[in-house]
UniProtKB/Swiss-Prot annotation:
GO terms for molecular function: melanocyte-stimulating hormone receptor activity. The chain crosses the membrane at residues 38-63, 73-93, 119-140, 164-183, 192-211, 241-266, 280-300. This is Melanocyte-stimulating hormone receptor. Receptor for MSH (alpha, beta and gamma) and ACTH. The activity of this receptor is mediated by G proteins which activate adenylate cyclase. Mediates melanogenesis, the production of eumelanin (black/brown) and phaeomelanin (red/yellow), via regulation of cAMP signaling in melanocytes. Its main location: membrane.
Length: 317
């Protein structure tokens, strides 16, 4: 079993079998270029997980409390919050188990610990897949609300949204189970990478199309009211900035992790790739940072949700 928290498996779960390690990470003693390794202390890792846990729990509680938020759009936001919550919980659980094992406070048989590691692996992987699917579902929901506004309520019903969410979780659990089973197969790694790229392309296409449509609509209104051209440009720049932040956060937080998976499949023994593998803990921390940012982008911008959140906080006190 690994002796330190930095020796994590592919998904950040606990890898206890030495025979599995070569599949997940190349040997650390390879000769090659000097590596830059960014250390993420366990304390910081735990703090990020706790912030994400509290933040996403509040989002779920606010949506559950207010019946006005029981709409398809907020169902997808709630699904995203639940996924992000599980990402933080699974990483918190993993870090806690590793720390307890390191200090000798937790004693267990190797088979029991291995089974626990597999459970955490499945939990982490399924929550990550469902989080990506939820981001794609939110983008599609917003796209339909703009381009099919008159038919939106007949296309995106609450029942269909719930079925879509159920399908997302079923697919996430199934895919994560298969991935953990065949983690040492290159095809399994590439499937996850292709899935991430598909979500990135889907979100980029949908949001760019929405931005173009919004700019055209703003120009039409400006011509109608005979506004000045700089006003139109300012609105377009604001929309472009919002789009850049939305897609930029997604890519910066998730991209390094999937780059890690790609390099494991492409160059597992190359010295340069080995340098990147040493920062795997940082890549997991970036994903947890994304679970902290998601509520700020998708949930807390809603005035109704913020009002309900205040009520939840006041009630808890």
């Amino acid at each position: 079993m690994p002796a330190q928290g930095s020796q994590r498996g592919l998904l950040g779960a606990v890898n206890f079998t030495p025979t599995a390690t070569p599949h997940l990470r190349p040997a650390a003693n390879q000769t090659g270029p000097q590596c830059l390794e960014v250390s993420v202390p366990d304390g910081l890792f735990l703090c990020l997980g706790l912030v994400s846990l509290v933040e996403n729990t509040l989002v779920v509680a606010a949506i559950a409390k207010n019946r006005n938020l029981h709409s398809p759009m907020y169902c997808f936001i709630c699904c995203l919050a639940l996924s992000d919550l599980l990402v933080s919980v699974s990483n918190l659980l993993e870090t806690a188990v590793l720390l307890l094992l390191e200090v000798g406070a937790l004693a267990a048989q190797a088979t029991v610990v291995q089974q626990l590691g597999n459970v955490i692996d499945v939990l982490i992987c399924s929550s990550m897949v469902s989080s990506l699917c939820s981001l794609g579902a939110i983008a599609m929901d917003r796209y339909i609300s703009i381009f099919y506004a008159l038919r939106y309520h007949s296309i995106v019903t609450l029942a269909r949204a719930r079925r879509a969410i159920a399908a997302v979780w079923a697919a996430s659990i199934l895919s994560s189970t298969l991935f953990i089973t065949y983690y040492d197969r290159t095809a399994a790694l590439l499937c996850l990478v292709v899935f991430f790229l598909a979500m990135l392309v889907l979100m980029a296409l949908l949001y760019v199309h929405m931005l173009i449509q919004a700019c055209q609509h703003a120009q039409a209104i400006a011509r109608l009211h005979k506004r000045q051209h700089p006003v139109q440009q300012g609105w377009g720049l604001k929309g472009a900035a919002t789009l850049t932040i939305l897609l930029g956060v997604f890519f910066l937080c998730w991209g390094p992790f999937f780059l890690h998976l790609t390099l494991i499949a492409v160059c597992p023994q190359h010295p340069t790739c080995s340098c990147i593998f040493k920062n795997f803990r940082l890549f997991l921390a970036l994903i947890i940072c994304n679970t902290i940012v998601d509520p700020l982008i998708y949930a807390f911008r809603s005035q109704e949700l913020r009002r309900t959140l205040k009520e939840v906080l006041l009630f808890s006190w």
